[in-house]
Design a protein with these regions (language model features):
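Ligand-binding loop in jelly-roll beta-barrel domains
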Residues: 84-85, 93-119
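Conserved hydrophobic/aromatic beta-strand scaffold that supports enzyme active sites
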Residues: 40-44, 61, 80, 88-90, ...
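A short, N-terminal "cap"/entry segment at the start of jelly-roll beta-barrel domains
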Residues: 1-37, 123-126
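Conserved short histidine dyad/triad with adjacent acidic residue
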Residues: 24-25, 29, 41-56, 93
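Short beta-strand His + acidic residue motifs that chelate non-heme Fe in jelly-roll/DSBH
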Residues: 52-53, 71-72, 80, 91, ...
Length: 126
C-alpha cells in the first residue's frame, strides 16, 4: 500500500452500488488505494428524493458541499432533519433513511465516508 494516493476526478469509480435518486462515485477504496476499512465517495442527487436505504453495519459521516437536504429516518421515516452546505451528518449502522434534495433546480453534493471497504448500500422496498 502506498502511503499517499492521489485520486483524480476521472479515476473515481462510477459503477458502485446505487440508490434511486442518487449518483455515487467512489474515491477512497481498496481498488484505488489498496486500503482496508475505509470508503469515501462523492454523492450527487438531482432534485427529488432518494429511495429508502441503509448501509448495513457501517457508520457513515456526510459533509454537505453544495445545496440543502432533508433526511428522513426512524422506523417509519417519521423523523427528519435539514442540513446545508458546511454541515456534517452522522448516520449510525443499519439506520434506514431517505435524502431529499430541497432544491427544485440544482443538484446537491456531499462527501460520504464509511468504515467499510465498499459503498455498502442496502436498498429497502418502499
Amino acid at each position: 500500500m502506498e502511503n499517499i494516493v492521489l485520486i483524480k476526478p476521472h479515476e473515481r469509480i462510477t459503477n458502485t452500488a446505487q440508490t434511486s435518486g442518487m449518483i455515487r462515485q467512489a474515491a477512497v477504496t481498496p481498488e484505488l488505494c489498496n486500503n482496508n476499512g475505509l470508503w469515501v465517495g462523492l454523492v450527487s442527487a438531482p432534485p427529488g428524493s432518494s429511495g429508502a436505504h441503509h448501509h448495513g453495519d457501517a457508520e457513515s459521516a456526510i459533509y454537505i458541499i453544495r445545496g440543502k437536504i432533508r433526511m428522513y429516518f426512524g422506523d417509519n421515516l417519521e423523523t427528519s432533519l435539514e442540513a446545508e452546505a458546511g454541515d456534517f451528518i452522522y448516520v449510525a449502522p443499519n439506520t434506514i433513511h431517505v435524502e431529499e434534495n430541497l432544491s427544485s433546480e440544482e443538484p446537491v453534493e456531499f462527501i460520504v465516508a464509511r468504515n467499510a471497504t465498499s459503498s455498502l448500500v442496502v436498498n429497502v422496498s418502499e
